[in-house]
Design a protein with these regions (language model features):
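Active-site anion-handling motifs in enzyme catalytic cores
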Residues: 1-189
């Protein structure tokens, strides 16, 4: 059985720790497959990380545009948000030209508006896309017809219990934290 070369383009974890949860889940899923996979990992475009600081000098170098010898590119996270998908045309064109299959795994949108879906569909419909494993039903319903194979999946962060070894803490059994700047919902008093 041929070894597969797979490029996983995950979310940038330094500015959004939540991205690490699905990135690690995807790594776990791929390592659990019976076929030997050479997994290469990178994060989405770094200009996103710096855009919050209004940086115009952020690096626009994208290693994804220079890949060679990849059997699959795996796209994950909210990559079907219109602000993200606009940037991926050159990578999708190169994948199509090189015969590299594109998989959207643990993938979703961002705002889920009609405008976003229309814009994303307009770009994605130009390409032959291999597989969609959505992280939510809205994404599945919006894009399932654009892929050769489509599955109404879950976010790969749900696989954390399969690979993360926890330790006992001297705390209540359920403690919830959020990592954003706004106040989260109160689940318990």
């Amino acid at each position: 059985m041929k070894e597969l070369n797979v490029l996983h383009v995950g979310g940038y974890s330094s500015t959004n720790i939540g991205n690490a949860f699905y990135n690690l889940g995807i790594r776990h899923v791929l390592k659990s497959l019976p076929q030997k996979i050479n997994l290469y990992e990178t994060s989405d475009k770094q200009v996103y990380a710096w855009s919050r600081y209004n940086s115009t000098s952020a690096s626009h170098f994208d290693p994804c545009e220079h890949f060679t010898d990849m059997d699959y590119i795996i796209w994950s996270g909210p990559m079907m948000g219109k602000q993200y998908v606009r940037e991926w045309g050159p990578v999708l064109e190169k994948a199509e030209m090189m015969g590299t299959k594109v998989i959207c795994l643990s993938a979703g949108g961002n705002q889920y508006t009609n405008e976003e879906v229309e814009e994303v569909r307009k770009l994605l419909s130009k390409f032959h896309l291999y597989a969609l494993f959505s992280r939510d039903s809205e994404t599945y319903e919006s894009y399932r017809d654009l892929f050769e194979h489509s599955y109404n999946g879950i976010c790969c962060a749900f696989y954390i219990p399969e690979y993360f070894q926890s330790w006992e803490l001297d705390m209540e059994p359920y403690v919830v934290f959020i990592f954003v700047q706004y106040r989260g919902p109160c689940f318990v008093d």
